Amino acid sequence: MKAAALSWALMLSGCGVLGGAGLIGSAPPAGQMVPPEQLAPLAAPPPGRALWAELGQDAGPAHPVRAEGPRRFWRMDQGFVFVTEGARVVATAGLPTMLLASAPIGEDPLRRAAPLGPAPLRLSHSLDLAGADGRPEQMRFGQVVQCRLEPEEPAIGGLIERVEICEGAAAFTNRFWFRAADRVLIRSEQWIGRDVPPLRLEVAVEGG
């Protein structure tokens, strides 16, 4: 995974660091205001559709750049770049801390587009992290976290929320929202590195 992480860091070394100026754009009715039935599957967005991304107080559309197998590359107008694999955010660039790579240790159903069952799950991930300038001495490879995806709770407002609690090399909580009618993932809030806010994603509503 080191070679892939180094390639990612070099490829994106020209991305600027998001510095709090705000991501420009008028938001569609995102978040809890969007009825679940209007949202497309987050793990498999329709071709050409943008994601709506929220990072702290900043928000804006993230447009598809390219695809490599199951991975999708996205870029926001202010230069923040991230990669998704299924529902997982697996790499970032353009922030003070970069997630160079995230690899599953064992099975991770959230990296697939298939619906997730209601039972709790134990998951592990290996993370590669670096500073924004990608200097080798700042890189940390093979940082392992152990996670528990909590069992499914009763739906509220047509949504099922699943909470993933992780500890180990880093301690954080991820949240995933599924449409109750078909258990399709439509929204997520994910940790993407130390000292940066979580990244919240959903597929942008057409015409928004």
Predicted regions mapped to residue ranges:
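Bacterial N-terminal signal peptides that target proteins for export
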Residues: M1-S7
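C-terminal motif of bacterial Sec signal peptides marking the signal peptidase cleavage site
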Residues: M11-G14
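Acidic, serine/threonine-rich low-complexity disordered tracts
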Residues: G16-E107, R112-G208
